[in-house]
Amino acid sequence: MLVLFTDTDCDVSPKLAEELGYKLISMPYEIQGKSTRPFVDFEEFDPHPFYEQLRKGVLPNTYALNPYTYREYFEPIFKNGDDILYVHFSSAMSGTFNAMNIALDELKEEYPERKFYEIDTRGITLLSLNIVYEVSKLYKEGKSVEEILNWAEQEVDHFTVYFFAEDLNFFKHSGRVSGLAAFFGTLIGIRPIMFMDSDGKMKTCGKEHGRRNACRHLVNVMKEIGDNVQDYHIIIGHTDFQEGVDALVEILKQEFGKDVKYEVIDINPTIGSHCGPNAMGLCFHSTKR
């Protein structure tokens, strides 16, 4: 039997994981000296109190899981005689996968007949979630692991996310932009437009002055490179930024019709630790990243 895994950095909750047929790995963060594992140390994520702390100047950190924790997740599956397919966030964004590989090397010696497969979504949060949705669909249709992996090889780069943040200081803290760029960008209202490239790394592709122009930029990109977007999930993810969501949805309906279907999610606190409050992204099926 094949057992599906994903993680909270793909913005999957325990409830959604159960609906889609996944076991869920919790990716931790630390805030004010307290280590927290989403949906292990709390049942539901309440975004507003978390992001209010960040607005008041609290700077959280994230850290990698250790090999022992990965063993705790994977060994019971192997011991039961099952194989694993893990759909995860970008391996280029974290050292946690080094720890995972250490654990897997040990487990392969102990359970040599068992198989471990992985799909690197080369994304985070809503981009990864979109791929999690599609893999679940294929699995429930009875596709073999080889068919699912072949699909991923062809399709992962056909899901893309474009996003921006109103406060660049959190990207500065995580090393994504320089201190000077963060200071002046936030001061004069410049919103760099960013995306996840085919290597799973965050890149800047432009900049806009003001919230509404940034929202329009995201929708314009979807018009330009979107591919059968309404046959797949259109996902808007945000960090306690309802005003931005409202502006984006208004423009989305202007360009794609008032009946356009979309999903809005709260970005998880581990990823939110890096982008801060008032960040937002748009994910869709595309011709390219």
Residue ranges, per PLM feature:
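N-terminal glycine-rich anion-binding loop in soluble enzyme alpha/beta folds
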Residues: 3-63, 69
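Local beta-strand N-terminus motif with an aromatic residue
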Residues: 1-2, 81
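A short glycine/small-residue-enriched secondary-structure motif
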Residues: 44-51, 74, 78-79, 106
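Acidic/glycine-enriched edge-of-secondary-structure segments
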Residues: 51-67, 198-213
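Mixed-charge interfacial surface used for oligomerization/domain docking
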Residues: 3, 9-23, 28-30, 92-96, ...
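Glycine-rich phosphate- or other oxyanion-binding loops that anchor nucleotides, phosphorylated ligands
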Residues: 55-93, 98-102, 149
